[in-house]
Amino acid sequence: MKGVSATPSYVVMQPTTLCNLDCAYCYLPFRKDDKRMPVAVSAAVAEAVAPWSRTQRFSIVWHGGEPLAAGRDHLAALFAPFGPAVEHHIQTNATLIDDAWCDFFQAHDVRVSVSVDGPEHRNGERVTRGHRPAYDRIARGIRVLRRRDIPFSALCVVGRPEPGLATELYDYFLDLGCEVLGINVEEQEGVNERTNRHPAADVTAFWSELVAAWRRDPRIHLREIEWSLRYAAAVLDGNADAVLPRRLDPIPTVAHDGSVVLLSPELAGFHDPRYGDFTSGNVLTTPLAQILAGAAGTPWIAEFLEGVEACRRTCPYFGFCGGAHAANRYFEHGRFDVTETDHCRNSKIRLLEGVLDHARDHEPTAV
């Protein structure tokens, strides 16, 4: 894997900066403001992705605020320029979901992912603008999805990964009814400056316990565990080099105003004296394909690619993770050519070690 691909597999789009919640770990800088994406931005992106969607599966991920806060009429107008081959995904806090939104999801074949951190007592960081618990509203929205038979994924943020927690979380999500589950260990990024450094043994034990819980009842597609097992299988088959893509997915994030940040959505909306605003262009003035073709010319991206090569040279886990994410390098270290981050320790290194620990502990006994 070298360089940045000129063809993404999906585009992240920000229909509004506004979020009706005020989660303590959120990285977004403008979530109190309602800056809505003009339809002209959506139309420019739709024109760019049309040829890509004809040759591969292609998705638009509506994220970067609470997408439902943009309203059904405006979101429908943003969807309209895209062809039928483009999949639409929404990451939502679920608090606004009602039957009318379910009608919208079904009419537009939207794939829904909800953000919820486990049982009610695990959602203390997810609060309203008045700093009141949001769990009841989240759970109510999820109940509407289930009543309407709309499949959904779930995204769970874990603030303190430690032994005893993983089984509780997995059992909760089994009962919740999600089809896919992603586990994100809280990250120090954006406006969230809280440290995410944890004892290595605790994090490894958390992931190992999660594997055990999943193996007992693997009804849920557990994102991190399944990816780890695919990598382990590839190593055993001698195909480890084929796991990572040949080039980095550029993951273009198109902000509400059309500006484009590549590789890490978490950098959108931030500014640095050295790197500027991290953007590589704006779809209102430059076609997205042209922006992607010139990605390496963005100074911070060139520095990031140097960091990726440093990871390749020095880290035995590179074949699994492909190098620390750009935003984590920047928000933890202030630059992009560093290597190991707390995020990669928590969510890559300890993850793989936890999976391998579980495998060793449950290795069949020779007869």
Q: What is each PLM-predicted segment?
A:
Residues 5-40:
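Canonical Radical SAM [4Fe-4S] cluster-binding loop centered on the CxxxCxxC motif
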Residues 15-22, 66, 310-314, 318:
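Cysteine-centered iron-sulfur cluster-binding motifs in ferredoxin-type domains/subunits
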Residues 19, 23, 62, 90, ...:
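Conserved, mostly hydrophobic/aromatic
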Residues 44-61, 70-199:
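Radical SAM/AdoMet-radical enzyme domain recognition
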Residues 47-64, 338-367:
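Short Fe-S-cluster ligation motifs
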Residues 76-79, 319, 360-367:
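Short flanking/linker segments adjacent to small metal-binding domains or redox-active Cys/His motifs
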Residues 129-136, 143, 147-260, 265-283:
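Radical SAM enzyme [4Fe-4S]-AdoMet core and its adjacent flexible, acidic
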Residues 227-345:
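Accessory C-terminal segments flanking Radical SAM cores
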